[in-house]
């Protein structure tokens, strides 16, 4: 479930952000049990990455709730908890895109 939701998150962000940001890479932090998705400015090196942390509550991904946080310069801008069987809430995507719309390019480049 987590992997499927993570792929959905990446797809939805790419689609909704209309190439304002490009997806840089994903890293799995085993110690904190979280994925770290890094984004940057399109066509530019990412000096101050926009990060999306996706952490899960248990050792296994199946039937595990997830916490998703939008982080810029170590400040949490938005977060949501997604429970097993849920899709990413539509209102969170709207909130995320609205938050990203307030971020100036100079904040992330």
Task: Enumerate the language-model features and the residues they cover.
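Short intrinsically disordered terminal tails
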Residues: 1, 102-109
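Generic hydrophobic/packing signal
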Residues: 72-74, 100, 104
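Intrinsically disordered, low-complexity regulatory segments enriched in Ser/Thr/Pro
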Residues: 44-94
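Serine/proline-rich low-complexity intrinsically disordered segments, especially terminal tails, linkers
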Residues: 12, 16, 26, 57, ...
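Negatively charged, low-complexity tracts enriched in Asp/Glu with abundant Ser/Thr
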Residues: 1-45, 75-78
């Amino acid at each position: 479930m987590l992997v499927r939701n993570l792929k959905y998150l990446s797809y939805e962000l790419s689609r909704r952000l209309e190439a304002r940001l490009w997806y840089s890479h994903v890293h799995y932090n085993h110690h904190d049990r979280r994925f770290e998705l890094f984004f940057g400015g399109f066509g530019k090196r990412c000096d101050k990455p926009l990060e999306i942390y996706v952490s899960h509550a248990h050792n296994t991904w199946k039937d595990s709730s997830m916490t998703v946080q939008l982080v810029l310069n170590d400040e949490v801008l938005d977060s949501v908890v997604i429970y097993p069987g849920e899709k990413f809430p539509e209102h969170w995507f709207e909130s995320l895109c609205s938050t990203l719309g307030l971020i100036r390019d100079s904040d992330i480049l």
